């Protein structure tokens, strides 16, 4: 993951692989001089910085861990580069974004199918929500498949009971990978990679209110600062979609120049979307630029292999 400090003076990089733990690195913008690093949890990934607390919140994705073990969100003081707390959430947490007022942090647990809200001040989980679309959620709220579980051959007196329960636990089909707030802080957009949709969550009511059926494998998303458009990367389809939030319709879809579309960052003036594309094999990665006014691709820059996280630094004359 990548993030830039609110004052634009520093940028941060998560290094997922370690022995066994990963690290967060701090660099000076402009010179790219390394300033410091701090060890975090297993596979630290996406991060965000609060405008209210100034703290950095980063999910420990734990990609190589068990699909039954909950992981955490690390909270870091980016000035001192010290981890000050860890908040337990769900299995394989992904996405890490805060409201524009900086008071609430949101992440999703890919293998739990849950959206988590953390109070940025108290550093505690305050609410959780299934990322299932509304109608499905009513009939199967938490993804458990209890009716299909055969208990007849279980030895309830042995220590195998817990492991059997885990075996019969149904992994959520949604597999959420991203969450992003609307500029007005009244809506959240959650990407369900496994079921090919994005759900819109009302922050106050804390419920799913709209579902956008997307192309295959949506992965990341971002909303323009003017609140008009939602840009979604389709990792499996190798495409990028632009959605009009007033109508809930997709108004443009671009074929990316190579496979494995990854992240997106939008310019502060809401004009351009910058999309990272990983590529495969020996292929270089790329950043592709799309004009959100004309709805046309305008530029491409080839970069290192497997381009992933992307963040916007600044606009200059």
Model feature map: region roles:
Residues 1-317:
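Predominantly soluble domains enriched in secretory-pathway, periplasmic, or organellar proteins
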């Amino acid at each position: 993951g990548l993030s830039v400090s609110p004052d634009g003076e520093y940028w941060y990089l998560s290094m997922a692989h370690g022995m066994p733990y990963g690290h967060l690195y701090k660099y000076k913008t402009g010179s790219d001089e390394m300033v410091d690093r701090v060890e975090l949890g297993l596979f630290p990934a996406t991060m965000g910085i609060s405008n209210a607390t100034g703290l950095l919140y980063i999910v420990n994705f734990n990609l190589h861990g068990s699909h039954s073990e909950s992981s955490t969100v690390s909270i870091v003081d980016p000035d001192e580069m010290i981890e000050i707390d860890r908040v337990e959430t769900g299995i394989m947490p992904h996405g890490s974004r805060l409201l524009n007022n900086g008071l609430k942090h949101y992440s999703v647990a890919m293998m739990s199918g849950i959206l988590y809200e953390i109070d940025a001040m108290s550093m505690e989980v305050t609410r959780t929500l299934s990322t299932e679309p509304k109608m499905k959620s009513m009939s199967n709220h938490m993804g458990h498949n209890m009716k299909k579980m055969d208990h007849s051959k279980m030895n309830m007196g042995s220590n195998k009971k817990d492991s059997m329960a885990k075996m019969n636990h149904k992994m959520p089909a949604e597999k959420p990978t991203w969450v992003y707030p609307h500029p007005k802080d009244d809506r959240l957009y959650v990407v369900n990679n496994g079921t090919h949709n994005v759900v819109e969550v009302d922050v106050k009511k804390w419920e799913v209110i709209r579902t956008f059926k997307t192309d295959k494998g949506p992965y990341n998303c971002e909303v323009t600062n003017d609140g008009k458009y939602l840009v979604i990367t389709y990792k499996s389809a190798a495409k990028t979609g632009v959605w009009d939030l007033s109508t809930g319709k997709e108004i443009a879809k671009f074929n990316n120049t190579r496979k494995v579309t990854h992240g997106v960052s939008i310019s502060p003036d809401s004009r351009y979307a910058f999309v990272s594309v990983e590529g495969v094999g020996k292929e270089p990665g790329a950043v592709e630029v799309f004009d959100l006014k004309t709805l046309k691709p305008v530029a491409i820059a080839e970069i290192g292999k497997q381009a992933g996280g992307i963040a916007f630094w600044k606009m200059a004359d």
